[in-house]
Amino acid sequence: MTEQKAKSSKTSSEEAKKQKELTEIKIKLKSYDSRLLDQSVKKIFEIVKETGSKFCGPIPLPTKKEVFTIIRSPHVDKASREQFERRTHKRLIIIKNLKNETIQKLKRFVIPSGVELRIYL
């Protein structure tokens, strides 16, 4: 009997973990264009509001700034340089009380080119 109780407690804890995983997802969005990123976040929020799920965010994550320095002249002037910069904007959305309808609508959501979308379960 103790073995059965141990097995049942293990399975119930595993089921609880699975259920917890399915009730919350995290969506991470990245883009070089902050306006395009904000438009995508608004569309995702509209989908989540329609289906009745709860959400947190958008949580702005740190912007990654990359600077590239290039010599302007192909031959002599090493002192003459030009700098280019690329900023990667990031947002995090947490959706709680996830419903099947929400998942289906998010699957059909068309992501604009220039926005990277990752979903973490």
UniProtKB/Swiss-Prot annotation:
Keyword Ribosomal protein: yes or no?
A: yes
Residues passing through the membrane, by range = none
Q: Where is this region: Disordered?
A: 1-20
Q: Which HAMAP family match?
A: Ribosomal_uS10
Q: What is this protein called?
A: Small ribosomal subunit protein uS10
Q: What InterPro entries would the database entry show?
A: Ribosomal_uS10 (IPR001848), Ribosomal_uS10_CS (IPR018268), Ribosomal_uS10_dom (IPR027486), Ribosomal_uS10_dom_sf (IPR036838)
A single GO BP term for this record reads: translation
What assembly does the database describe for this protein? Part of the 30S ribosomal subunit.
What GO CC terms are in its UniProt record? ribonucleoprotein complex; ribosome
The family note in this entry says: Belongs to the universal ribosomal protein uS10 family.
Q: Which Pfam families match?
A: Ribosomal_S10 (PF00338)
Cite the entry's keywords alphabetically.
Ribonucleoprotein, Ribosomal protein
**What's a Gene Ontology MF term here?**
structural constituent of ribosome
The organism's superkingdom is given as Bacteria
Its biological purpose: Involved in the binding of tRNA to the ribosomes.
